[in-house]
């Protein structure tokens, strides 16, 4: 039996998570994205859901930083901080 290609995801399933492309690129977004996924997995959140939550939180953090004119991700918004702690984008 052939092994699965290394590009396959969790449980041998490729999952795609399209999102909007923002017109900005800020330092810290990759750290926030990866950290959110790892935190979700550590709490038992299934991988596809952890990715979706990470996308939502990262997008919101970028929007917030862009609105402030910041040059990096800003997590000072109380709503974002609560969502990060709870790993719930709503």
Swiss-Prot record:
Annotated GO molecular function terms are: catalytic activity
Q: Which Gene3D superfamilies match?
A: 3.40.1190.20
Keywords (alphabetical) are: Nodulation, Plasmid
Give a short account of what the protein does: Involved in nodulation of a particular host, M.lupulina.
Task: State what protein this is by name.
Answer: Nodulation protein NolS
Source organism of this protein record: Sinorhizobium meliloti (strain Sm2011 / Rm2011 / 2011)
Q: Which gene encodes it?
A: nolS
